[in-house]
From Swiss-Prot:
Enzyme class of the recorded protein, top EC level: transferase
Effect seen on changing V198A: In strain: Nonneuroinvasive mutant HF10
Cellular component aspect of the GO annotation: host cell nucleus; viral tegument
Protein name, entry field: Serine/threonine-protein kinase UL13
Lineage: Viruses, Duplodnaviria, Heunggongvirae, Peploviricota, Herviviricetes
Any one biological process term the GO annotation gives: symbiont-mediated suppression of host PKR/eIFalpha signaling
GO molecular function ontology, one term from the record: protein serine kinase activity
Organism (species): Human herpesvirus 1 (strain 17) (HHV-1)
EC number assigned by the record: 2.7.11.1
Family of the protein in this entry: Belongs to the protein kinase superfamily. Ser/Thr protein kinase family.
Domain of life: Viruses
Length: 518
């Protein structure tokens, strides 16, 4: 018989014995026996002499007796503690006497990230559906790490309103650290959702236009991504300084932005997720061997991601099994991901479509207050913003050098509070009515849903306030005086026409024309 598996009854006498055979006593039992065995009472009063002798003794030696009692109690308590600790230690010559814990250790060591992680095969797995439209997803535990211990030099990769990015170029990794704990949960869930959509889109539709995470740390509030060569803003500056006329550059641009447009449509329509923060700084690029042409471009930074009306997981939950916990850690769907926010939609105004700027000027915000974001709105906003980033490249790299004048995509910068103002919204709408007709392609391909560019009368017709209408008209007249003659002399090479057609469709004034890209 295997003696190691035998169990004693709960009331067995051996249950009160230590591994060394001595009976275990509580502190209360020990103190009682000590007091009874002491020749003096617990109060320090002698038991033998009379009350008069006791009074004399207290008056002459009370302090000595009290101090002596305290010392004996302190010494006895120390011996009792030592005996208790020795009882807990198993005898070295007795096999199998180590005390077994009835609970797991307080904390098991988790894995630190010491080597560059590989791309995961999956990020989320549907485990069950608790209620109608309340799925529970298990997060791939292989993505979780405690600390980042990958060797290599760190360099500054960028900073934003929600976090900072460090680059480990030796291993081609980018580590984003979120500043606030509350916002980290929002961005982590958004990143995991988009990452799972990216993996599925790559397998089923060969769409790879979004960056996918490689790992994350709850303790450090970090998310690890693959590093790219630079963002689109830096690439535009580099390309403008080269003044290249190589047709392969525009061809690669057209391919990459077409891929990005497909990714935006897939994310909004199939996954029910709108990015809402597409700009040059959030598009990462990788160059070919010539260090000029694009090899790949992906959308990054999911800080403002919002689930639109096509999503079926707005009430979803996420669980992560950690080594130091018996039950998995649960995450609910953050509210910031499920409700529309007009301030988020409008942003700074640089890349927002005209219909959204008109709603801002008319103060039409009811449809965006505590409501789900409509799919067609999210898709129209994302596609227009993508077209504006491509227009930024065309103006900076091709238009401005050909004119010899620093023409920009928008009329100017905001200096007050870095927020959209009615004055700047009017300036944007009026400036586009002059810039877009000079660059957009006017053809049957782009005019299926009407003119691709904005005209003053079309904007003016939708403005409700007469004062705002007059201000808009004045702005249009001013920009026609200052820019129309210059822009009329723009002459771009014919190999740029596919790129301009794509800009015209992405930034079409009619949202339905943008939806037609899907």
């Amino acid at each position: 018989m295997d003696e190691s598996r035998r169990q004693r009854p709960a009331g067995h006498v051996a249950a009160n014995l230590s591994p060394q055979g001595a009976r275990q006593r509580s502190f209360k039992d020990w103190l009682a026996s000590y007091v009874h065995s002491n020749p003096h009472g617990a109060s320090g009063r002698p038991s033998g002499p009379s009350l008069q002798d006791a009074a004399v003794s207290r008056s002459s030696h009370g302090s000595r007796h009290r101090s002596g009692l305290r010392e004996r109690l302190r010494a006895g308590l120390s011996r009792w503690r030592m005996s208790r600790s020795s009882h807990r230690r198993a005898s070295p010559e007795t096999p199998g006497t180590a005390a077994k814990l009835n609970r797991p250790p307080l904390r098991r060591s988790q894995a630190a990230l010491t080597a560059p992680p590989s791309s995961p095969s999956h990020i989320l797995t549907l485990t069950r559906i608790r209620k109608l439209c309340s799925p529970v997803f298990a997060i791939n535990p292989a993505l979780h790490y405690t600390t980042l211990e990958i060797p290599g030099a760190r360099s500054f990769g960028g900073s934003g309103g929600y976090g900072d990015v460090q680059l480990i170029r030796e291993h081609k990794l980018a580590v984003k650290t979120i500043k606030e704990k509350e916002w980290f949960a929002v961005e982590l869930i958004a990143t995991l959702l988009v990452g799972e959509c990216v993996l599925r889109a790559g397998r089923t539709h060969n769409i790879r236009g979004f960056i996918a995470p490689l790992g994350f740390s709850l303790q450090q509030r970090q998310i690890v991504f693959p590093a790219y060569d630079m963002d689109l803003g830096k690439y535009i500056g580099q390309l403008a300084s080269l003044r290249t006329t190589n047709p392969s550059v525009s061809t690669a641009l057209h391919q990459c932005f077409t891929e990005l447009a497909r990714a935006v449509v897939f994310l909004n329509t199939t996954c029910g997720i709108s990015h809402l923060d597409i700009k040059c700084a959030n598009i990462l690029v990788m160059l070919r061997s010539d260090a000029v042409s694009l090899r790949r471009a992906v959308l990054a930074d999911f800080s403002l991601v919002t689930l639109n009306s096509n999503s079926t997981i707005a009430r979803g939950q996420f669980c992560l099994q950690e080594p130091d916990l018996k039950s998995p850690r649960m995450f609910g769907m953050p509210t910031a991901l499920t409700t529309a926010n007009f301030h988020t939609l409008v942003g700074h105004g640089y890349n927002q479509p005209p219909e959204l700027l008109v709603k801002y000027l008319n103060n039409e915000r009811a449809e965006f207050t505590n409501h789900r974001l409509k799919h067609d709105v999210g898709l129209a906003v994302d596609l227009y913003a993508l077209g504006q980033t491509l227009l930024e490249l065309v103006v900076s790299v091709y238009v401005a050098p050909s004119l010899g004048v620093p023409v920009t995509r928008f009329p100017g910068y905001q200096y007050f509070n870095n927020q959209l103002s009615p004055d700047f919204a009017l300036a944007l709408l009026a400036y586009r009515c002059v810039l877009h007709p000079a660059l957009f392609v006017n053809s049957a391909e782009t005019n299926t849903h009407g003119l691709a560019y904005d005209v003053p009368e079309g904007i003016r017709r939708h403005l409700r306030n007469p004062k705002i209408r007059r201000a808009f008209t004045d702005r249009c007249i001013n920009y026609q005086h200052t820019h129309k003659a210059i822009l009329s002399s723009v002459a771009l090479p014919p190999e740029l026409k596919p790129l301009l057609v794509l800009v015209s469709r992405l930034c079409h004034t009619n949202p339905c024309a943008r939806h037609a890209l899907s």
